[in-house]
C-alpha cells in the first residue's frame, strides 16, 4: 500500500480525517439528510464519502461528526473504500479467521468481511493478532494504517 499514487494517499488522508471526527458506520441516512453536519469543517468530506457509499449515518438522520470512531468502524470504512478501488473481498472471508478476537461466525458479518479484506490487503494488521474492534481508533493507530 505504500507505493500507491498520490491521489490514493490524498483520498485516504481525507477519509481518515472524516473518520477521526465521525462515527460513520451505523446504517442509514444519506449525507443530504444529515441534520448535524451543516457548518462542520469536514462537511464536504462527509458528503463525498457518504455519496460514495463509504460511510453512513445513524438511523435518526444524524452523522455525529464529533463522535469517537471504533477500530471496527474504521475497518468497515476502509473496506468499503478499498472495494471502490477494485480490491475484492477474499473468497474465504467467512471461513478463515483473520483476527483472534473476531471469529468468522461473529454477529457482525460485515465487519468479518471487511476485516478479511483490509488484513489481506495489508492495510490493517491489528495488535498481537487482535483487531480490538470495539476499542476507539487512536490518531497514532490511524497514522500507522495510512502508512
Task: Show where each model-derived region lies.
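Short, intrinsically disordered, charge-balanced linker/junction segments flanking boundaries
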Residues: 141-147
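Feature responds to low-complexity, polar/acidic, surface-exposed segments characteristic
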Residues: 2-41, 56-110, 120, 124-140
Amino acid at each position: 500500500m505504500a507505493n500507491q499514487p498520490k491521489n490514493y494517499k490524498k483520498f485516504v488522508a481525507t477519509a481518515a480525517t472524516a473518520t477521526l471526527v465521525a462515527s460513520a458506520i451505523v446504517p442509514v441516512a444519506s449525507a443530504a439528510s444529515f441534520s448535524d453536519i451543516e457548518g462542520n469543517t469536514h462537511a464536504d468530506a462527509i458528503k463525498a464519502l457518504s455519496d460514495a457509499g463509504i460511510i453512513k449515518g445513524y438511523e435518526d438522520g444524524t452523522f455525529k461528526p464529533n463522535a469517537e470512531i471504533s477500530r471496527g468502524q474504521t475497518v468497515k470504512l476502509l473496506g468499503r473504500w478499498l472495494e471502490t478501488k477494485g480490491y475484492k473481498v477474499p473468497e474465504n472471508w467467512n471461513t478463515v479467521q483473520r483476527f483472534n478476537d473476531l471469529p468468522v461466525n461473529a454477529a457482525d458479518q460485515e465487519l468479518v468481511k471487511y476485516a478479511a479484506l483490509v488484513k489481506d490487503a495489508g492495510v490493517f494488521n491489528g495488535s498481537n493478532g487482535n483487531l480490538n474492534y470495539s476499542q476507539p481508533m487512536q490518531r497514532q493507530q490511524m497514522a500507522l494504517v495510512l502508512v
